[in-house]
Amino acid sequence: MKNIEFAARFIPSSFVSGDIYNVFRLDENHIGLYQIDVSGHGVVAAFFSVSLYRQLTQDLYPKGLLKVPLSEPPHYEINHPKKVIALLDKEYSSMLAAQGHYFTMVYGILNIKTGELSLCRAGHTFPLFISSTKGEAYYIKEGGPPIGFGLPRFDESKTIKLAPGDKVVLFSDGVNESVSPQGTLYGIERIKEFLLKHHSLPLSEAFDLLLKDVKSFQGKEEFSDDVSILGLTWLDNK
């Protein structure tokens, strides 16, 4: 896709991973993307990660989660991110609660013709929007609770119209919850300021510099939690 540039980084902790992310085609005009962080570590967390990956891979597990079949052309309707999160909550909450787990998530749909990006967040770290024209960045805070607590869903979503050069970044809490030897959190504001400072770089380069900075901040190379970062740059809609 000539009008979109994706970048991602993943660094697993020393335990079995609970972070997953993906970018995929929904149809000729839409792309789906998500990032999920399953609580805890070990086999149970990995099991839920694999199960969620299968659920969100429509060719492997077509159950109407991402699309609803229709009798008339185009014979499907793409589910809004709010609906996808509500369906996952309905299917997984009781299973997760029984195992003492939960997961956080951001799910988004990008219209590759118009540049409209719709996002919904379930307890996950805030997605970061970086404007190319205004030279500013802000967190998209709309959303609802994590999945697995059995809480009522009151999810809010956000739709933004991307301009050429705009960036959106998703990251797991393994980044912002990194801790210095003095006990200070790296924090989401530090991430925002760092990526805004390097907004002229391709995201792949900016992510490498960010991870280098986090490692320097915490005084070690290893992370105590999984670290995953997923970002996109809207280049143009022509």
Predicted region positions:
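C-terminal catalytic subdomain
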Residues: 86, 161-170, 175-238
